[in-house]
């Protein structure tokens, strides 16, 4: 149930208002219906097609077909790229409104990918959109936004509490006009997917800089 905090002294009530906006309500209802009527039935097809498969890093015949059916249906309904706040490339939702959408996506293991809102692609697309060069956006962001490829994200390192990005020790050093990366990563999200075409790697370029840089 939506939560509305009581007024406290002179505090602004808006900062406690966690209700979905009225503008997002139609989209939320559409997503909810899609998950129940399209995503879940296709997920059942996906599971059935994968019975007997032993390799976790491959897809059995029929699995990707079920997934692509869902993606095609989502595209046709305009249920695509909700996570990007920029309305030109995404839906222009606030984080609060997207939280409600994400809660519905979580009711089916494939719903997020069917609507192109699955990690690690979501964060990788945000990085490319905000700091990517025009060439990088054309080569990598565009096919990611279109759901044609998948991506990976490499931050975790052996022996280091890597959930805090300040701790990463992998180095990137400029050698002429090329960056040379030295280090070790593991538990790389998305790397095992055969559709993965790009990996974003967290590295240090200036080890003597302040920790937050």
Please tell me what each predicted stretch does:
Residues 2-119, 130, 135-139, 143, ...:
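Amphipathic, small/basic residue-rich leader segments at the start of a protein or domain
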Residues 170-173:
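A structural signal for short hydrophobic beta-strand segments in well-ordered beta-sheet cores
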